[in-house]
């Protein structure tokens, strides 16, 4: 019983000591390409978003970084993004492993397949630029995704 209590306390202290997530704009001076979408981002039920105009990464830094980082690309059929269950909800697990975790909120292609890819490329550049500050190794940045985000991750890796 004491062992279970100790492990639970250790796990909770790791979660609580991780830093608060930070959302960083990918293109503060405007994106280099367009998908011709206008208007405001649509926040849908279940933590989904559509019509992303200003792409970002949300970075979750662990209390004790091991140097590795994962960029997560949520899915949504290239029409919307399942930001919570295919993104933010996994952050605490990665952080308990010492892995810095970043969730990409990317723009939809809307006929221009380069738009989401350029957002993913910029996210990797930004992660590597902050390597020293975040305690990560710029050569240990991985990417993963779910559904359309998996396609984007695979495209980024080629």
Put a short name on every predicted segment.
Residues 1-22:
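Bacterial Sec-dependent N-terminal signal peptides
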Residues 66-68, 97-100, 138-140:
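Loop/turn elements at helix/coil->beta-strand transitions in domains of secreted/extracellular proteins
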Residues 77-79, 101, 126:
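Serine-hydrolase catalytic-loop signature spanning alpha/beta hydrolases and amidase-signature enzymes
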Residues 83-102:
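Short amphipathic alpha-helix adjacent to the substrate-entry channel of hydrolases
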Residues 122-158:
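Primarily recognizes the serine-hydrolase "nucleophile elbow" in alpha/beta-hydrolase
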Residues 67-76:
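Short beta-strand element of the alpha/beta-hydrolase
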């Amino acid at each position: 019983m004491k062992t279970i209590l100790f492990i639970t306390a250790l796990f909770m202290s790791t979660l609580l000591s991780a830093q608060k997530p930070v959302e960083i704009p990918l293109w503060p001076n405007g994106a280099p390409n367009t998908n011709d979408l206008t208007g405001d981002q649509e926040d849908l039920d279940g933590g989904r978003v559509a019509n992303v105009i200003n792409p970002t990464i949300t970075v979750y830094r662990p209390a004790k970084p091991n140097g590795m980082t994962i960029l997560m690309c949520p899915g949504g059929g290239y029409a919307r993004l399942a930001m919570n269950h295919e993104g933010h909800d996994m952050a605490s697990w990665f952080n308990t492993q010492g892995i810095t975790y970043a969730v990409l909120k990317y723009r939809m292609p809307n006929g221009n397949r380069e738009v989401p890819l350029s957002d993913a490329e910029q996210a990797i550049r930004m992660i590597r630029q902050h390597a020293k500050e975040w305690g990560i190794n710029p050569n240990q940045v991985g990417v993963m995704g779910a559904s359309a985000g998996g396609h984007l991750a695979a495209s980024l890796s080629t």
